[in-house]
């Protein structure tokens, strides 16, 4: 197989580096910092060792989304995108970029996405969950992207014809009481998936994809649990005497199988992959590692040996991403 394409692969700039400190033991923090700040050295060597031809890079989480001050959020997003563009320009055959976006201000986010796609050559955006804005309850209310204020932004995403990767972040403290006393459930063990799955379901139910059917949303971690629940979600909404009303015109499974793509980032289990293929089809699944929070060798060695057909391995490992992100043009 030609080299794999991996697309949930993170980096940091000094201003956002400490956002990742809480997700690893203190003894590992020095190594994680080095991994996040490195692009051209260890990362590239590991890519070569494990037949990863291209990485699409994105800013660590929550970064821009957790900056309530509008001007600072815009500044950090632009700074991170400029740094990433410089790094990608050194090895355009190996690295591509996802835009970081200041969605505290939908118009500013649309403008920055436009700049990143048309001037910097980025292939889409990766946004770390909901945003916080000082103008909305001082930043204490999460802003989810099904809200009406984001419709013009989504129209621009569709017009630019680039995918949007919805990446996790933890819920705000006031929304995380169920985790009190159980910090092991926060972050990638559970809270990330729950938070992101609900956000994605809100997008589906809002009617967004009826208005903008060309949108393509990417979810990591084998779909954040949604594929296993699609039948039940639609079944219960249809079965009850008075179905819960939502604006969307179709079933959740219709939007998920037509407007969503899923990656294997940070979830290296063959049984889960096979279930995902049965629910979504091999044309909408893509390989990823979640470096540097997961190890490249773990992801690549698992995927290269997974019990799937070679045709599916090629699609998942390379051609789906190459097509979606127009990398072979």
Curated annotation (Swiss-Prot):
Binds 1 Zn(2+) ion per subunit. The gene is tsdA. SUPFAM superfamilies: Metallo-dependent hydrolases. Involved in the gamma-resorcylate (2,6-dihydroxybenzoate) catabolism. Catalyzes the reversible decarboxylation of gamma-resorcylate to resorcinol. The active site is at residue 290. Pathway: Aromatic compound metabolism. Disruption phenotype: The mutant is unable to grow on gamma-resorcylate as a sole energy and carbon source. Zn(2+) binds at residues 8, 10, 167, 290. Keywords: Decarboxylase, Lyase, Metal-binding, Zinc. Induction: Induced in the presence of gamma-resorcylate. Belongs to the metallo-dependent hydrolases superfamily. ACMSD family. It holds the Pfam family Amidohydro_2. Its cofactor is Zn(2+). GO terms for cellular component: cytosol. One of its GO terms (molecular function) is carboxy-lyase activity. Its EC number is 4.1.1.103. It catalyses: 2,6-dihydroxybenzoate + H(+) = resorcinol + CO2. The keyword Metal-binding applies. This is Gamma-resorcylate decarboxylase. GO terms for biological process: secondary metabolic process. The keyword Metal-binding applies.
